[in-house]
Amino acid sequence: MRKLIGILFFLFLFSFYLSVAFAHEAYVLNNEQFTQGLKEFSANPLAPLFDPSKIQISIIITAIVVLVYLVNVLFSTTKNAAFLDKKIKKISVIGPFLIRLAVGASLFIGAQSDALFAPELSISFLPFSETLEIIITITSIMIFLGIFTEVAAIFALCIFTLATFFYGQYMITYANYLGEIIVLILFGSRFLSIDSILFRKKLFISKLERFKHLEVPIVRILYGIALIYAAYSIKFLHQSIPMMVYDEYSLKQVFNASAEYISAGAGLTELTIGLFIFVGFAQRLTVTIMLIFLTLSLIYFKELVWPHLILFGIAISLIINSGDKLTLDYYFIPWIRKRIQILKSIAKK
């Protein structure tokens, strides 16, 4: 019984540990702290993970992750998994719809708060800010309602481009927005939208219909890029920023580990999850894990909800529309299934 309690307690701490990976430091720290952190660079951010005093914990965590993913891969080869996949994909249209609502709501709420895509990106910093705020508000309403969605998305792309000109490569952190904007420009939104009444299912450019299968991959790949870049640029390149979060929220009381170790582990976790989403490996499991710990982070650090709407929207969409033709899962799972069948046939002989 004591061992069981010990294991459960360890898993609880492990879950909380992973939630730190999805704490968005720009929402948790004040602007002065975040700006100061960007000026400080880390020499060897992964070194704490190989500290002899913590190597055992690192090995245990790695073993747990490998085991969970191994079980997931094996389950994915079963008939039950295939049956569940078909059931889930029957509501595939819900995914893009949720993302559209999330983008529209995020842009609208952000505009009312002098924020573009995220709290740290001030609209006031951009030229013609008052006019821009009005344009963003109108664009957000058009996207949310799904009226002339392609046109609204073109405006959104222009706004994203303008922000990139002033905020530079930091905008890669919000490549998830770019992915959805591109998809809306190409394919619009014909589900529960005003456009569906005006144009039915017809696209503005009908020839783009043949590329509709790229809708999910575009969103997924750019979402993965956003996570990978956030992990690298903040938790690795500027490790003092997550360390500030560690100190600010007294996380030492929760973890028996240094701020450097937790920051490095959180960074590696976010990087791995971003990479798995990018290549489409164990997509449903990976996105579900991300969704759970994103929620835990949101609750514990009391972050603003609206910047996370698009993250939740994309996550739910990727869970529903998992295993597209440009994912590793699409090829890897059938290959594993065949290998298992071969082994079973050999065993029978």
Predicted regions and their residues:
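Short tryptophan-centered beta-strand motifs in secreted/extracellular beta-sheet-rich domains
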Residues: 140-144, 274
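N-terminal secretory/membrane targeting signals
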Residues: 1-24
